[in-house]
Amino acid sequence: MIKQRVFAWTDTYDIYDEYGNPKYFVKTEFFNIGHHMHIYDMYDQEIGVIHQEIFHLLPVFEVEIGGRTISRIQRRFSLFTPRYDIEYHGWQVQGDLFGWDYDVYDGSYCIAHISKELFRWGDTYVIDIANPEDEILGLMLVLAIDAANCSNNSD
């Protein structure tokens, strides 16, 4: 579960496991062009970075783990609903991205289901990831899509 703080000078996301225990946290750099997020475990060890590539018509994000770029997420042009291309082993996003109820697939295998909880103070997202090995990348994908949606809304 991801919870965004409502009143903060920088965006901070607290990420909890299925039992409500803190598992990760995300810090967003404040004075940057484009989004730049660092994901940490509870021992303050950085586990990944998401940064927005600038000079693109639509939002593009690179996902780095261990200093290596492992994925790229790009918003595609679409008239009515947001669509994304994910450059990672054929992963695809399907569902209602505006309503925050969507799935991430690898072929026909559902990797993750993402939904937004309503009537909460601040944005709260629930992420169900089927395989623990996909947890970090699945989490980073959700954060990048959230940032891309925010980028488009502020344009």
PLM segments and residue spans:
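Intrinsically disordered, low-complexity proline/glycine-rich segments
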Residues: 1-155
